[in-house]
Amino acid sequence: MPFAEEETSLARCYAAAGPARCREALAQVLALPEGTRYLAFSPDVLERIASRYGPVRVGFTGALTEEELARYGRSRAVQGISAGDAHEFLCQLQADEAFSPVRTAAARAAVWDAFLRQDLTLLPATLPDALRASSTALLTDFAAQDYTLLGTVLEFLANNSALPHAEALPGAWDAKAGTYTVTDDSRAAVQTFLSVSPASGNDASLREP
């Protein structure tokens, strides 16, 4: 993202200039709607958050082939997995040079999407508290009241049987450096997901009653 007349990572921008400046940079890079909040965290933090939900059943069809799964003693059948085991498996994939970062990201999306879908009624009670407990490790512009608001929104969604949706954004991955760089394809995917017009930067859905 742009920062101090150069490009840098979200983590470096956050450490140097704080959450508000990072929000400005993200909005500029991804053409986000006005008022958008952001929440980013590492795989380690995600594992700690997901561990509150217990084991879930995950299928990797569409993310990994049968041969790829067999290398790690797994199959394409839906299988039970804990947050810790999922994190370990994903780390193995990331370290395996035979797997592209894009394939690893697809597997990661499949795993954590399953954790969020496991029991919608748990989300309002557990996710905000789990995020608060890991607040020092988050990259976010959430204020204290935003975690409460998140719980309210999640409760509304759970009561109306809304389902979480996870996607792995396209972009430029550098496996050795462990970095991800936003590209034109990344921007287009975000704009499609949020129904954002690149010209206006506004979400049409936000204008609906």
Place the predicted regions along the sequence by residue.
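Solvent-exposed loop/turn segments at secondary-structure junctions
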Residues: 1-3, 43-48, 63-67, 118-119, ...
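Amphipathic, coiled-coil-like alpha-helical scaffolding segments used for oligomerization/assembly
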Residues: 16-75
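Extracytoplasmic/secreted envelope proteins and their assembly/folding machinery
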Residues: 19-27, 43-47, 51, 87-90, ...
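Flexible, polar/acidic helix-loop-strand segments at domain edges
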Residues: 51-131
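C-terminal solvent-exposed extensions
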Residues: 1-7, 139-209
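Short, surface-exposed acidic
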Residues: 32-35, 117-128, 146-149, 202
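Second-shell loop/turn segments in exported
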Residues: 8-17, 31-37, 94-103, 119-120, ...
